[in-house]
Each structure stands twice: as structure tokens, then as C-alpha cells.
Amino acid sequence: MSASTAAPARDRLRIAIQKSGRLAEPARSLLAACGLSWRQSRDKLFCYGESLPVDLLLVRDDDIPGLIADGVCDLGIVGQNELEEQAAERRGNGLPAAYHAVRGVGFGQCRLMLAVPEEWDWQGVAQLAGKRIATSYPAILADWLERQGIEATVVELSGSVEIAPRLGTADLICDLVSSGATLAANQLKPVELVMESEAVLAGAVREPADARAGLLAMLLRRMDGVLKLRDSKLLMFRADQDNVDALRRLLPDADPLVQLPDDGNGVLRLQTMCHGAVTWQRLEELERAGAQGLMVLTVERSLA
């Protein structure tokens, strides 16, 4: 099916995620936190949604953008780098991407970087002129080189990019970097950022207008709640009215304080949602400022 052909009406939402790899488990955990559960097929590539009419397709990450563009899947969780690589490739072929990043999902952070042999004295991007650069992301790299005004040869490799300089097939590489350990093991050093990336929820530019529309809206609302609460804690404490302003200043990343019914002795009962780390040091600061009976609670679900 071409990207311009309307997808057939369906009453079940279909989401593509990585079958295996670094995004597979976090993606399934995120969707499970949204209340989804599945029954896996014998071939282990299709998971039938049981709690909601939302099915999973387990595929290679580089298949996900195309499945969305062709209307086979409504959504996918995929690296932004993979999404942009295929979008750039489609633009180069005169085709619309037909998909977009709906939102980041809070994991899979990495950087697409140029890396050179450790012995290079790196002076800047002007050194790239005439060089051979090995990468698995040729379209992104070609776009970046064009913006920099650099003429270089892009050597496309599907894997093991980091050994290309040692094999003599390239002078340097452009590859994803998380910790930098793989580069160091191959006597390479990162020198220039090409793209920041993370896992994203991707969807079709044209959203479904049939029964899937309501499912999509519900899933996105649940996902917003899960992502908002991922690093959030409910903080409850008591305090005198005179100390409230000082306590509020110690909670810049928290929602407005909510006053609960007091017990009649003039001490206020307060609670707030903190969206940053609630460390022991932070609790001790609050205590010194007048907070009493501090409690930190995990919140599993929220509909705002």
C-alpha cells in the first residue's frame, strides 16, 4: 500500500515495537503501564490485545517507519534517529514521510556523532573535506554535511561501523554513542554532534477517523499520565501557616500545595506532586524549614 492510499477501516489499534534490542523491553513496559496486556501468537511476532483492542507487532526497528507510512500500523515506538533517517531518505526520493514523532517516551537517549581515530588532532569540521565517513545513517549524515557546506564521501554500512577505519574502508565514522565504551575499545574518540536522539512514539500524519480514533486518544492520555509520573512522587506533610511560604520556595519543581482538612489544632495538612528527585537531603531541608511528618508516596496512575 502506498503512503497516499487510505488505510482500510479497522476497529483495532496496531502498534509496532522492536522485537529485540535496547528499546524492546522499555517499550513493552511503557505500554503495560498504560494498561495494555496481550496474548502472543505462535510465531511470536504478533501480540493480540486482551485488555483493550490494541495489538502489538514485533519487528525490526528499521521496519517501523515504513509500517506506519504504509498504514499497516497506527503507531510505533522507535528511535528518533531511525525515524529521521527514513524520512530523509523518502524526501530524497520525492516522497512525503507520512509519519511524525508524536512525543518522546523518556528512554533510549543517545547521540549520533562523528568519531575519529584517537591520534587525530581534531580542529573542526573543515577537516572532513574529501574524507570517507562510514555510517548506518547515510541520509542524516548527507543532510548534515550539506548544511555544513562540506564535501565528503559517505560510506554506507549496515553494522560494525566502528571497525571501518581500522579496515581502511573509511577515515572516520558517524555512529550512535551512548556511553562511548565501544568507541574507546576501537581507538576512536567522538568529536562532533550530528543529532541528539531518543525513543519516540511515532504516528501517521493522517490520524485514523474510524473506531481507532477513540482508542488513540485514550492511549495518548494514559501515556501522558505514565510519563508525567515516571519521576514524580506525592509529598505529604504538616506545617504551621507561618512556614508555608518558605516551604513553597523549597519546592520549585512541585505542583501548587494543596491544603487538606486539618485536625483543628491550627497545623495545616499539605500535599503536592514533586516532579524531581525527592532525596533525603531535600526532606531534611524541608524539615528544617518547618515541615513535620514528611511522607513520600509513589503514584502509579493519574488522569489529569
Swiss-Prot record:
It is an enzyme of class 2 (transferase). The keyword NAD does not apply. Keywords: Amino-acid biosynthesis, ATP-binding, Cytoplasm, Glycosyltransferase, Histidine biosynthesis, Magnesium, Metal-binding, Nucleotide-binding, Transferase. It is found in: Cytoplasm. It catalyses: 1-(5-phospho-beta-D-ribosyl)-ATP + diphosphate = 5-phospho-alpha-D-ribose 1-diphosphate + ATP. Signal peptide: none annotated. InterPro entries: ATP-PRT_HisG_long, ATP_PRibTrfase_cat, ATP_PRibTrfase_CS, ATP_PRibTrfase_HisG, HisG_C, N-reg_PII/ATP_PRibTrfase_C. GO terms for cellular component: cytoplasm. The keyword Transmembrane does not apply. It comes from the Bacteria. CDD domains: PBP2_HisGL2. One of its GO terms (molecular function) is ATP binding. Feedback inhibited by histidine. Pfam families: HisG, HisG_C. One of its GO terms (biological process) is L-histidine biosynthetic process. Pathway: Amino-acid biosynthesis; L-histidine biosynthesis; L-histidine from 5-phospho-alpha-D-ribose 1-diphosphate: step 1/9. Belongs to the ATP phosphoribosyltransferase family. Long subfamily. Catalyzes the condensation of ATP and 5-phosphoribose 1-diphosphate to form N'-(5'-phosphoribosyl)-ATP (PR-ATP). Has a crucial role in the pathway because the rate of histidine biosynthesis seems to be controlled primarily by regulation of HisG enzymatic activity. This is ATP phosphoribosyltransferase. The lineage of its organism: Bacteria, Pseudomonadati, Pseudomonadota, Gammaproteobacteria, Lysobacterales.
